[in-house]
Amino acid sequence: MRFLLTSLTAAMTLGLATPAQAWGPIGHRVTGAIADRNLSGVARANVRLLLGEDDLAEAATWPDDMKSDPADFWQKTASPWHYVTVKEGDVYKGSDAPPQGDAMTALTRFTATLRDPKAPVEDRRLALRFIVHIIGDLHQPLHAGGGDDRGGNNVRVTWFGRATNLHSVWDSAMIEQRSLSYSELADWLSRSITPEQTILWSQSDPQVWLRESIALRKTIYPADPALSWDYAYQHRTQVDGRLQRAGIRIAAYLNWLFEPAATTPAKAR
């Protein structure tokens, strides 16, 4: 890991970034659990080699867990790798990313590391954990923020009477409100994914995921800041769909990464 941390730090200017939590622990674990069920045999074997007894549900939360580490790498360098900023009406371009990078540039960098058979095992393990996490992040609409309200962090709302912000509602409040464990929610969401949806969702790429999140972003800002059952009901299908797609796409992406003969994620199954 020391090699990767050093090279990444040298390649990216250190800088404080907008705080972001992405999906909360339950949401991220759900995406990892769904992904686990859709790995190819080759990908599953490689994941086991890198993670040992850990599974993708645990790997999915690891980059957020490490935010408590006081090291500059976690507090500054890695902080902006959980989101992107795309202003309304614009399209994402990597050249517009800040000097320290963003979720899309980090995904590209970690993809190259994981595909490099000569990279140290610790570097590839770090890359795998970040890839699983970042793909989940890119499916949270407020992690494709427009740059004017810190991805909904500045939008003050109440959730069943409790003061919070819109970002937190989407990260965790709507998921936790259902009172299901991550494994129960992953089971329930997995049962409703059809074979046709699995194929369709596996054919996309990070730019597609990002465009989907940006399109949803426009629909989730409430006219009334007092949020409760109506808001939860209105957006439950969107939340479920993003978690499902993220899980399928994590698996498809890893299947592709670990099977170099496949030209696209959809063919690596």
Residue ranges of predicted features:
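N-terminal, motif-rich segments that launch catalysis or mediate targeting to/interaction with membranes
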Residues: 21-134, 141-269
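Positively charged n-region of N-terminal signal peptides that target proteins for export
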Residues: 1-5
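Bacterial N-terminal signal peptides
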Residues: 6-15
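N-terminal signal peptide c-region/cleavage motif recognized by signal peptidases
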Residues: 17-19
